[in-house]
Curated annotation (Swiss-Prot):
Protein name as catalogued: Glutamyl-tRNA reductase
Annotated site location: Important for activity: H91
Annotated NCBIfam families: hemA
Reactions the enzyme catalyzes: (S)-4-amino-5-oxopentanoate + tRNA(Glu) + NADP(+) = L-glutamyl-tRNA(Glu) + NADPH + H(+)
Organism: Xylella fastidiosa (strain 9a5c)
Key words of the record: NADP, Oxidoreductase, Porphyrin biosynthesis
Function: Catalyzes the NADPH-dependent reduction of glutamyl-tRNA(Glu) to glutamate 1-semialdehyde (GSA).
Active site: C50 (nucleophile)
Binding site for substrate: T49, C50, N51, R52, S101, E106, S107, Q108, Q112
Pathway membership, UniProt: Porphyrin-containing compound metabolism; protoporphyrin-IX biosynthesis; 5-aminolevulinate from L-glutamyl-tRNA(Glu): step 1/2
Domain text: Possesses an unusual extended V-shaped dimeric structure with each monomer consisting of three distinct domains arranged along a curved 'spinal' alpha-helix. The N-terminal catalytic domain specifically recognizes the glutamate moiety of the substrate. The second domain is the NADPH-binding domain, and the third C-terminal domain is responsible for dimerization.
Highest rank taxon of the organism: Bacteria
Amino acid sequence: MTLWVLGLNHQTAPMELRERASFVGDALPRALDSLRNLPNVNEAALLSTCNRTELYAETTNAQILLNWLEQHRPGLQNHLYQYRDAAAVRHLFRVATGLDSMVLGESQILGQVKDSWSMARTHGTLGNTLDRLFQHGFSVAKHARTNTRIGANPVSIASTAVRLAQDAFSPLNESTVLLIGTGETIQLAAKHLSEGRVQRLLIANRTHAKAQMLASQHGGYALPLTELNLHLAEADIIFSATAAPTPIVTQSNVESALHIRKRKPMLLFDLAIPRDIETEVGTLTDAYLYTIDDLERAVEENRRSRREAAETAEAIIELQVKRYMDTLQAHAHQAPLRRLRTFGTTTRDELLTRARQQLANGRPAEEVLEQLAHGLTNRLLHPPTAALREAALANNTELVRAAEQLFPEKPGYHHPTLQTTIVKTDETDPAS
C-alpha cells in the first residue's frame, strides 16, 4: 500500500473554491463514513480548515481518491496537489508545524490536525499507518516549536498591537479595553484580548447590532458609536479600525479623558487607513499612540525572525522525514523475518520432539544426534538453496548477490554447487 495526500490550500485555490471544498459540521463524519467503504482504501483522514482541505489515505490507487473527491466536491481537479510516501510525510510535518500556513508558524493548525486525527479514529478510518504518521507529526511539530522561534513573535498587525498592550499593561485582567469598529482587524484583536483575559471589554460601532454580536462572542459590552466620548475615559487601552473618512478620536477628546482619569496613561492603537485617531493625540503627555506604520515595522521584524526560524524548522523536518521513512522500511521487513524465525523454531521443535522419542525408544544417542543434525541442516537449508538455484537459472543476480552478502566466501572455502550452477546459467542463457 502507498501513502497519499490530496488537497488544496490558500496557495492553490481562491477563497470561494476553498469554501466549496471544505467539510464542515456533519459533512465531515459523513465523508469519513463514505471513505471507509471505498475499495482498496485501507485508511483515511480529512483535514478541513478555512485555508485547506486535505485527504490523507493509504491506498494502492490514488485515482480512487480523485474520483471520490470529484464526486463529493466537484470542480477541484485543477487546484489539487498530490504527494506520495516521503513527500506526503514531509507535507504533514510541515502543515502541523505551521510552515505551510498562510501566517508562517501559526499554532492553531496543530490543534486542527489533532482534531482531524481524532475524528478519523472515532469513525474507524484510522489504522496503524496513519495513526503512526500523525503521532509522529505531533512530535515533530512540538520539537520544531520548542527548538526554534517559529511561533515566538506575532506577525499580524492586530496580534502585534495586543502583544504591545500586554507588555504595557500587564496583566490585562486589571485593564479596560475599548475596541472601535467590528471589522476583521478588530475581531482578531478581540480574540487575542479575550484569550489574555482582559478585565473589561467595551466595543463601539456605528451598527450597534454588530457590536452586540462581537461583544457576546468575547464577553464584552456593546456601545453605540454616538456614546464613544462618554466612555473614552474608562479605557486604559484603545484599538480603533473603522472605515470612517475622518478621525473619530480627536486630540480634545483624549485630553478630556486624561483629565477625568487624573493623567492615568492611555495606550492607543490606530489600525485604520485613513486614520481614526488624530496624529496630535501622540503629542499629549500620558497618551501613547501607535499607528499602522509603527506596528508594521515590528511586524516585519517578527516576520524576518520567523523566516529564519523556518529554515531551522525545515532542517528538523527533513531529518524526521528520513527517520520516519527508515522506520517504515524496517517495519516492511518485519513480516518475512518473523516468518523465517517461525520456520526455524517450528523445524527445531518438530525434529527435537522426534529425537526425544527415539532416545526414549532406546536408540543410541550418537545416531539420534547425527540424524538430528542432518535433519536440521537439510530442513533449514533446502528452501534457500532451492530458491538460489531457481534464481541462478533465471539469471536473478540480485538474489544471488544478497546471498553472497549474507554468507561471504572465506579464504579456502568454496560453494561448488552454487558456483557451478551460476556458470552453467551464464553459458547456456542466450540472453547473456
